[in-house]
Design a protein with these regions (language model features):
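Short, well-ordered secondary-structure "scaffold" segments embedded in the functional core
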Residues: 27-191
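Short, amphipathic alpha-helical "recognition" segments used to contact nucleic acids or chromatin
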Residues: 11-24
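Catalytic micro-motifs at enzyme active sites that drive phosphoryl/nucleotidyl and oxygen chemistry
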Residues: 4-6, 18-19, 101-105
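Short, Lys/Arg-enriched anionic-surface-contact patches
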Residues: 1-13
Length: 191
């Protein structure tokens, strides 16, 4: 929005500022000097672009895709009937003003958690980001949309393989913190 003092930043300039800030270790002040704006304007541009990416692009880019291709890809690597691999990672952040203690992870630094499900090529098929670093991976998974879809039986089609006399549904590879994925996949909808 234009004001009496200056014209509003164009979308192109906002995106350029955000990309520059996200791609370099430069401070907000340095990026602001580069583009002729204040550091608070840099912060606002980064947040606006990040929200636009989240709202408009994530659902188009981070998708499950063709489940059979994923299952075949994992089978070629020795993991039959696998629909993905899940894990979490900590993204370092500056200490927030409020509830800072909630963001200190087990390694002692401030972070937010990214939980991701990837396909056989390591491409994201589901992400959940933003939980405070102190929160355990199992709790994050239990409260994720991915867990809900697994519980409802809507993430993977009703595809099973038979090993001996046992029918096995599609599974997800993960560490012990994500052991609940096993239960969620194997539970029938409505149980």
């Amino acid at each position: 929005m234009n004001t009496k003092m200056r014209a509003a930043l164009t979308v192109e300039k906002r995106v350029a500022i955000a990309l520059w800030k996200l791609a370099t270790p430069d401070s907000y002040r340095s990026v602001g000097n580069q583009f002729g704006v204040g550091k608070s304007t840099v912060g606002a541009a980064v947040m606006q672009v990040a929200h636009a990416i989240k709202d408009l692009l994530i659902s188009r880019v981070v998708t499950l895709g063709n489940v059979q291709v994923i299952v075949d890809g994992f089978a070629a690597m020795g993991f039959p009937n696998c629909g993905g691999a899940i894990d979490g990672t900590h993204i370092p952040i500056l200490a927030p003003e409020h509830q800072a203690a909630e963001y200190i992870n087990r390694k002692g630094y401030f972070s937010i958690v990214l939980q991701a499900l990837v396909n056989h090529k390591g491409r994201f098929t589901n992400i959940n980001v933003g939980w405070p670093g102190k929160v355990h991976d199992a709790r994050i998974f239990r409260n994720s949309g991915l867990f809900q879809k697994l519980q409802e039986g809507t993430l993977f089609p009703d595809q099973k393989i038979t090993v001996g006399d046992v029918e096995m549904p599609i599974c997800i590879l993960g560490d012990p913190a994500n052991a609940m994925a096993h239960e969620a996949v194997h539970r029938q909808p409505g149980q």
